Amino acid sequence: MSHEAVWQHVLEHIRRSITEVEFHTWFERIRPLGIRDGVLELAVPTSFALDWIRRHYAGLIQEALGLLGAQAPRFELRVVPGVVVQEDIFQAAPAEAPRPKLNPKYTFENFVVGPNNSMAHAAAVAVAESPGRAYNPLFIYGGVGLGKTHLMHAVGHSVAKRFPHLRIEYVSTETFTNELINAIREDRMTEFRERYRSVDLLLVDDVQFIAGKERTQEEFFHTFNALYEAHKQIILSSDRPPKDILTLEARLRSRFEWGLITDIQPPDLETRIAILKMNAEQRGLRIPEDALEYIARQVTSNIRELEGALMRAIAFASLNGVELTRAVAAKALSDIFAPRELEADPLEIIRKVADHFGLKPEELTGSGRKKEVVLPRQLAMYLVRELTRASLPEIGQLFGGRDHTTVLYAIQKVQELAESDREVQGLLRTLREACT
């Protein structure tokens, strides 16, 4: 991780811990110079600023570095007169703007497509190519951090590039509600309606928060109608489908269901690894496959947390001057994932089982059907299923590309044996202890 990226993460932590006035006064003009021998070097504009920051914020900076994995968090301040802010440092934590903008990082080019999101991606691409005609509205739902906002912004970028004359508006439901309240209070409803009803593409994030807000629903209902009747594109995101949004007016629910409803599921292992690879490549880093797989196995449901875990591991390695290996990744994430929660390595399970029976791992994963291999292979499949988050198809791939039904049969067979055979019970107990 570059020193700029390390400082960016430090700033994000600091910003959450102090007031905006403090942040703008003391931190906006600090520039990271580099990392030398594990020490983050920072440039400040004056000796007064250096002294003030050292006396009042040193502990906070060290705390932020510690959260990134620095074993002995250290930084050094240096006066560099006329130091200027590098804007990219603050992109991840911008000051509040009067209008939200599309995130330049969220494009189709860096959206990793997998079985969990392929339909949503295809629909988003279709809408970007022909707004107002393909699917209107497009309703994307799924859990937090799975890529809904990424897809919405990607559509916005694509439409802006293809049709530069079109007006695009991205807004969260919370912002829409707050702006509506202010417009009512300040008697600016005509201006408010003009803004949202004159766009060609309206992107509304977290629309589930509109539920229960009568005036907001009323206004959004008329905004929706105006845009839809004018053949303008509407894209909505939510953490649940329309039918599950309680206290949502029936007339809005029915309109949300007029177009295409598509979901995004948590990514599978291969997709998670691909996401991590892309993130690493974008930073010009080459990270060993087993380190990426380790991280991918620890974070299974949330892409935002997955990327955060990667950044933590990269920062940990950078701050401690070591290469990012599987072992380093495990150490970097050890205080996030308690030891009992850390997932066993499937390949290590296979090796342990093979060793116990005096076999080679390739014999368990190969196609051989010798009697002395069958039970150990079934036990290994059972333990991989029990001790990891691997799905049946993923386990099948580990064992020579076997079908998931074969894996299921092996697991059920071991369960049956364990219920009636004390020797198998003891064997499982021994192997389980060896693998965890």
Swiss-Prot record:
A GO MF term: ATP binding
Keywords associated with the record: ATP-binding, Cytoplasm, DNA replication, DNA-binding, Hydrolase, Lipid-binding, Nucleotide-binding
Positions of the UniProt region annotated as Domain III, AAA+ region: 101-317
InterPro entries, sorted: AAA+_ATPase (IPR003593), Chromosome_initiator_DnaA (IPR001957), Chromosome_initiator_DnaA-like (IPR020591), Chromosome_initiator_DnaA_CS (IPR018312), DnaA_C (IPR013159), DnaA_dom (IPR013317), DnaA_N_dom (IPR024633), DnaA_N_sf (IPR038454)
Reactions this protein catalyses: ATP + H2O = ADP + phosphate + H(+)
Thermal dependence of activity, per record: Optimum temperature is greater than 60 degrees Celsius, at higher temperatures in vitro DNA-binding became unstable.
Function statement: Plays an essential role in the initiation and regulation of chromosomal replication. ATP-DnaA binds to the origin of replication (oriC) to initiate formation of the DNA replication initiation complex once per cell cycle. Binds the DnaA box (a 9 base pair repeat at the origin) and separates the double-stranded (ds)DNA. Forms a right-handed helical filament on oriC DNA; dsDNA binds to the exterior of the filament while single-stranded (ss)DNA is stabiized in the filament's interior. The DnaA box consensus is 5'-TTATC[CA]A[CA]A-3' in this bacterium; oriC consists of 13 clustered DnaA boxes and a 40 base pair AT-rich region. ATP-DnaA binds cooperatively to multiple DnaA boxes, while ADP-DnaA binds with low cooperativity to the individual DnaA boxes. About 16-18 DnaA protein molecules bind their sites in oriC. Has a slow ATPase activity. Binds linear and supercoiled DNA.
Name of this chain's protein: Chromosomal replication initiator protein DnaA
Organism, scientific name: Thermus thermophilus (strain ATCC 27634 / DSM 579 / HB8)
